[in-house]
Amino acid sequence: IVTTMLQQQVKDYLLRLIQEFFKKLQLLMEKGSKVNEAEKLSIINDCHAFFSNSFAVSDTDNTEIIIEKVKDKDLLDLYVKLLLTEFEVTSRNKEKLSIVLELIEYLQNTDATFSWERTILREDILRILDENNK
């Protein structure tokens, strides 16, 4: 029981930490200023560093490896959010978007809790990928 409580405390701490990154990024995105591009990239890099340091996730990992490394569904949801935000802000890398789609589908298939947000994200990603293929 003590181990489970400790694991939950660590998970809660990690969730709060990464959510703070996203709050900062959201504030910058709402401002919409090009002046903040460097700061947006810095926060995205901080988020990647967080996942790299906490779970050894690297930029070259495929979907299966990411799922192996980040076993918690809440943290996987946040990683999806990070990759999608990175796509929107910077790279427009379709390969990353495909990973996001695969992660969302994995979460939909393995998490008994229905997530409207995941459903909408999945539809948005499919639309973007379809537009890029035309």
What is each residue range found by the language model?
Residues E64-T110:
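Amphipathic protein-protein interaction modules
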